[in-house]
Amino acid sequence: MVIGAAARVAIGGCRKLISSHTSLLLVSSQCRQMSMDAQSVSEKLRSSGLLRTQGLIGGKWLDSYDNKTIKVNNPATGEIIADVACMGTKETNDAIASSYEAFTSWSRLTAGERSKVLRRWYDLLIAHKEELGQLITLEQGKPLKEAIGEVAYGASFIEYYAEEAKRVYGDIIPPNLSDRRLLVLKQPVGVVGAITPWNFPLAMITRKVGPALASGCTVVVKPSELTPLTALAAAELALQAGVPPGALNVVMGNAPEIGDALLTSPQVRKITFTGSTAVGKKLMAAAAPTVKKVSLELGGNAPSIVFDDADLDVAVKGTLAAKFRNSGQTCVCANRVLVQDGIYDKFAEAFSEAVQKLEVGDGFRDGTTQGPLINDAAVQKVETFVQDAVSKGAKIIIGGKRHSLGMTFYEPTVIRDVSDNMIMSKEEIFGPVAPLIRFKTEEDAIRIANDTIAGLAAYIFTNSVQRSWRVFEALEYGLVGVNEGLISTEVAPFGGVKQSGLGREGSKYGMDEYLEIKYVCLGDMNRH
């Protein structure tokens, strides 16, 4: 009931993927060679013990209670990588009970003891970054270099919160009366339900689990059904690092049942979710009856604003990075490229030339910079957006159609003369399409950029410090990059405003999301 509709779309999309893959397996010999490479990677991961297919409950690897499974596919080839346990209500309730029981002992460890466990987990993640990167490429599709980069990025949150665990400070308040002493304590909120997406199968987990465990909370993770294998591998390394049974549980499979169990259980005191705004709203409503704390990192509609005075090379490089990372499948991707009149044509030409050089292919192939989209439903969405724009007067400079590789590959695309009556200027594309929108003045740029319900990330390219200051103050976004397209880091807060979410992840502020504040008043303190 709670996340059922979205989950069924995701699961249905997976089934569509299998059937479409079957019909598309008459691809080139190049794709068949890719298939062989993926198979060898899968075999290596299995022999290393990192290719787990069971859920983790109470420190034990378990099949689903009814022995049902779901298939995990390689989006580049359509091949089945593994059959993983398809868990539901009963398994999730047991995972919650396990986390609830483990909370007492885990939260009573000293911060230093929890820190050491997290540090060992970080060390293991880094030691296995090649295998984890291969696993990400296998089930999510992004290029191997980018996937290994995600492992380093994801691990950085575990390292950071291993250190931050020892810096959860309370406060002493000057008393209002002479016989009182006033204290403020910070204590872990309790059991956390973490629901994570497919586009960053490792980093979206560590960004939530790191601060949760560091603060003394215990966690039940529900990874995406499309990419559960990375989550399970990370959990295996967490066990090896000494995370005790029950402190970290992983259940996957029947998304509606798992979501409902997490949201309705009074033992779960917090929900943290990364995903679409539509699903986030449903989670908020479902969390209300038990008044859970909720953190939401939701959809974006990021503008990349290129002013006339921008350095053209810097603007092209930064916008390229902001738009085409993970084939455009990130919530902070530049969804709209706003370009001022005086530089519009020059930017369009230079940017298109840069996009033309992107290499599309299987993530395991050397030189690939753009992998497949996650499934056929994602490709169909991109096609719909492009067709809508063209029908309303936009012009395709390059790309604009499925790639000759077939499957779920889509050509990196640049479209000019995009206007605000087109779907792609209003909704998240989540694909490798860059719409170029013309503007005249600074005021126009700010108005266009803010004309959206979203407010996650924005980017500015200008050589004027004064202009950058005026614009980033006026932009209604949680993150702003100035002359830079890749801005997320473990040491800075990540999160949106408006309908892009609640709360922050990363940095010292991310720790506060997993802590309760307790005020203590000591009276009769003048008695001898």
Swiss-Prot record:
Residues given in the record as substrate binding sites: R207, R325, S488
InterPro entries: Ald_DH/histidinol_DH (IPR016161), Ald_DH_C (IPR016163), Ald_DH_CS_CYS (IPR016160), Ald_DH_CS_GLU (IPR029510), Ald_DH_N (IPR016162), Aldehyde_DH_dom (IPR015590), Aldehyde_DH_Superfamily (IPR050740), Succ_semiAld_DH (IPR010102)
Organism: Arabidopsis thaliana (Mouse-ear cress)
Presequence boundaries: 1-34
Amino acids binding NAD(+): 196-198, 222-225, 275-280, 297, 428-430
Superkingdom to which the source organism belongs: Eukaryota
One Pfam family this sequence matches: Aldedh
Localization: Mitochondrion matrix
Function summary: Oxidizes specifically succinate semialdehyde. Involved in plant response to environmental stress by preventing the accumulation of reactive oxygen species, probably by regulating proline, gamma-hydroxybutyrate (GHB) and gamma-aminobutyrate (GABA) levels. Required for the maintenance of the shoot apical meristem (SAM) structure and subsequent adaxial-abaxial axis-dependent development of cotyledons and leaves.
PROSITE patterns to which the protein is assigned, alphabetical: ALDEHYDE_DEHYDR_CYS, ALDEHYDE_DEHYDR_GLU
Activity regulation information from UniProt: Competitive inhibition by NADH. Inhibited by ATP, ADP and AMP. Redox-regulated. Inhibited under oxydizing conditions.
Gene that this polypeptide is encoded by: ALDH5F1
Name of the protein this chain belongs to: Succinate-semialdehyde dehydrogenase, mitochondrial
